[in-house]
Regions:
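Conserved catalytic-core motifs of GNAT/GCN5-like acyltransferases
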Residues: 127-130, 142-185
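Conserved GNAT acetyl-CoA-binding A-motif
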Residues: 118-129
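Helix-turn-helix
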Residues: 137
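Residues forming the Rossmann-fold NAD(P)(H) cofactor-binding site
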Residues: 104, 108, 112
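Short glycine-rich hinge loops at helix-strand junctions in the catalytic core
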Residues: 105, 122, 145
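Acetyl-CoA-dependent GNAT
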Residues: 3, 7-99, 111-113, 117, ...
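Active-site acidic-Proline motif in GNAT/NAT acetyltransferases
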Residues: 98-100, 104, 132-133
Length: 191
């Protein structure tokens, strides 16, 4: 099937709602969060992502009007969505593919387009983080040329508002023993 990848304008409210729902659904389907998780509202809030970063979507059909099957966020320097990037690095966040559309290479196509877009916008490097348990994502990023960067690893705990609190090493060790920590591993790619 033909597909189209394009940027989503912040004024495309219905598309942004669709993207938010798809993002939350993908994270739920993978068991990364449950319905009560404080991150769900942030996953659903594609409107904020589109206003403070570049949101890409893939839709079925050449006309760009079909259903959204995947999305990724390209985060520029200075955005409030930056978690890892420094200087003129860009960051990729919230790659999500419809659970019923997996196996079509959608994640790879979206990631490549996001990498290309970051370079078009002046990125010296592209960084991202992913949960330690997301082995399929690790393989995807490594196939696409991302290098594992232990210096970008970080450990967080969830806040009630859907944000995360970055922990010091000592705090992380304690939280990991208590089972409340989430360890994220970092990757980077240079054009």
């Amino acid at each position: 099937m033909a597909e189209t990848i394009r940027s989503v304008d912040p004024s495309e409210s219905s598309r942004l709602t669709e993207i938010g729902q798809l993002t939350a659904l993908a994270y739920l389907a993978d068991g990364l969060v449950d319905q009560a998780h404080p991150y769900i509202p942030q996953l659903k809030d594609a409107h904020t992502r589109a206003s403070d970063a570049e949101l890409l979507m893939m839709v079925d059909g050449e006309d760009g009007e079909g259903p959204v099957v995947g999305t990724i966020t390209v985060v520029p320097p200075g955005s409030s969505l930056v978690e890892l990037a420094t200087g003129d690095e860009f960051e990729l966040r919230m790659l999500a593919v419809s659970p019923i559309e997996r196996g079509r290479g959608i994640g790879a196509k979206l990631t490549q387009r996001a990498m290309d877009r970051a370079v078009e916008l002046g990125a010296s490097r592209v960084v991202l983080s992913t949960m330690e348990t997301m082995h399929v994502a690790h393989r995807l990023y490594e196939r696409m040329g991302f290098q594992r960067r232990e210096d970008l690893d970080w450990t967080v705990i969830d806040n009630d508002d859907g944000t995360v609190q970055r922990l010091s090493r000592a705090e992380a060790d304690k939280a990991e023993r208590a089972g409340t920590a989430i360890h994220l591993i970092g990757y980077s790619w240079a054009p």
